Amino acid sequence: MKKWIALLLAVAMMAMLGACAAPAAPAATEAPAATEAATQAPAATPEPTVAPLEAAEVQLFIAASLEGAFKEIIPLYNESQPNVTITYNADSSGTLLTQVQEGFACDVFFSAAVSQVKTLEDEGYMIANSRVDLLGNKLALITLKGSGTAVTGFADLAKAKSIALADGSVPAGKYTRQLLIKLGMLDGTKEAKDYTTADVSAALGGVEINECSNVSKVKEAVKEGSNEVGTVYYSDAYSVKDDVDILEVADNTLTGDILYPVCRVNNPEATAAQSAAADDFIAFLQTDAVKAIFEKYMFII
């Protein structure tokens, strides 16, 4: 009997020792919750509608430097959406902003600078989350072919007899003034856009300056020989490359990034069909076919 008890105790002891020696099975762990950044897919580029849209007229405001490209883009859009009429208004971004503020009907606003679109957003004109920074550009200094100018680049602008220059409310004019600040020709005591034409003339030794209301007028003034040199976007310069020489293209470290944002604008008079067509047109502007047109006109994608 004692032997049986001893044997049972020995077996029990061995079982207890085995339990203590064996490692505890790991508890099942829950997969870590994925972070929002990891699970949230990047916003997809919207696709334009394939089916024909209802008849509508979209009011499009575009920076003057975009006009050439849009003369190709709008007919291309109408190949797939013949019921939609795109009516465009091309001028300086500053003028277009003022028109929106004054109550002009606008559905889509395509600026040559961020500041105008930021103002639309701050003042409640822009539809939330509709802004797309679609294009880039650079500032160029041009002269008529055979002009014989002594100017070789921005650094010796003072050698010009006359300069065509957009005013400070025009993005190209503001970028030019920013460049002159960076080069030490303007003193930098105020914002670039606030330097008047007279300020710029005085800083350049009294050179005659033809103040232009948009960049297209600068381009035409140089192309026609009315002014010796002028500052325009590279895309503008390239569009008249047979008539002008490009003296210099400025690095964006001198001008700041030149971005072209497009956005939707609150239009209280717009019908549902008009709003749908405006949204669709912005989606169309982001397609490869349209990007190819912008690249053809030397915009930066």
Region roles according to the model:
Residues 1-9:
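Positively charged n-region of N-terminal signal peptides that target proteins for export
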Residues 4, 21, 28, 33-34, ...:
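Exported/periplasmic ABC-transporter solute-binding proteins
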Residues 15-19:
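C-terminal motif of bacterial Sec signal peptides marking the signal peptidase cleavage site
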Residues 97:
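Short acidic/polar micro-motifs at solvent-exposed secondary-structure junctions
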Residues 103, 107-113, 117-123, 127-133:
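Short beta-strand-centered segments that line the small-molecule binding cleft or hinge
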